[in-house]
């Protein structure tokens, strides 16, 4: 009899992440049986609950945007410093060269989790129901959905928005009830969450380049046979390559799909990004004062 692995996520069928988890499961289907809850928010659960569910071995494998780990792993906020990285490849290089090892050790030592890898969660952009975002005045008095991250809340308040922290579960409801004026997400989430139906101004700000942590319960993993562990690690590595490719393909086609929904799109200029960078620079400085070992800037 094959061992059963319980897997869970927080996005729908069309999501890059859901399709990537499908790929991972298929790679291992000859060795393991799987119970897969694709979107726990449909069951009324918060996306953030995936962390405790995996740590406690209620499920064995999950993915989740790294920001949700900030209270348990505050150094992860390096990936959440707005306008800090110039492009996604810069972040990927940092992860591969330095950050992966650090995060992996922290998860194993402190959280009973084993890191299977980082997934591409997309460049994050800002949409509103009023106008494009190009200076502080364009942010003024807009109620923007942020994650429950204290850093995110403070950053958007600083820019002039009114931060409304919501888990993915509650964000979907706030959208349908028209209770927010703005939000920030990668293009794939903008589309799959249906933001294009109510927010017709999309600013390509690339203020963050997001990544998900793809993890397995450490106790569960350690009890597996060596061959089973090898198969999971091999499948995880192949899934990361597949997921990165899928994410790039998704982004390239989504712009036209979004435009076809009568959404106006504006790309933030370098000068505008630099002006916003000056505004949020204190958050960068505070982070590196608190976590000086996270200043990998010289080696990026």
Task: Identify the meaning behind each predicted range.
Residues 1-88, 108-109, 113-300:
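N-terminal secretory/targeting leader peptides
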Residues 86-107:
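A gly/proline- and charged-residue-enriched helix-loop-helix capping module
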């Amino acid at each position: 009899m094959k061992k059963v692995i319980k897997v869970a996520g927080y996005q729908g069928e069309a999501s890059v992440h859901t399709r990537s988890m499908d790929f991972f499961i298929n790679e291992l289907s000859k060795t393991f049986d799987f119970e897969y809850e694709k979107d726990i928010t449909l069951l009324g659960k918060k996306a953030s609950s995936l962390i405790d569910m995996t740590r406690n071995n209620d499920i064995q494998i999950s993915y989740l945007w790294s920001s949700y780990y900030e209270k348990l792993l505050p150094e992860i906020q390096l990936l959440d410093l707005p306008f800090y990285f110039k492009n996604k490849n810069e972040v990927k290089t940092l992860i591969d060269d330095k950050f992966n090892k650090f995060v992996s050790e922290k998860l194993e030592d402190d959280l009973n989790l084993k890191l299977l890898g980082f997934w591409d969660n997309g460049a994050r952009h800002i949409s509103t129901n009023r106008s494009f975002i190009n200076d502080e005045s364009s942010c003024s008095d807009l109620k923007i959905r942020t994650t429950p991250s204290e850093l995110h809340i403070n950053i958007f308040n600083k820019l002039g928005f009114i931060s409304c922290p919501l888990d993915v579960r509650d964000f979907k409801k706030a959208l349908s009830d028209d209770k927010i004026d703005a939000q920030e997400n990668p293009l794939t989430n903008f589309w799959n969450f249906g933001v294009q139906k109510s927010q017709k101004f999309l600013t390509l700000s690339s203020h963050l380049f997001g990544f998900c942590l793809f993890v397995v319960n450490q106790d569960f993993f350690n009890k597996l046979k060596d061959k089973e562990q090898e198969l999971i690690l091999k499948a995880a590595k192949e899934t990361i390559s597949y997921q990165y490719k899928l994410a790039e393909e998704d982004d390239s086609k989504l712009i036209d799909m979004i435009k076809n929904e009568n959404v106006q799109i504006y790309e933030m200029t370098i000068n505008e990004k630099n002006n916003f960078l000056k505004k949020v620079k204190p958050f960068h400085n505070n982070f590196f004062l608190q976590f000086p070992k996270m200043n990998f800037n010289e080696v990026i």
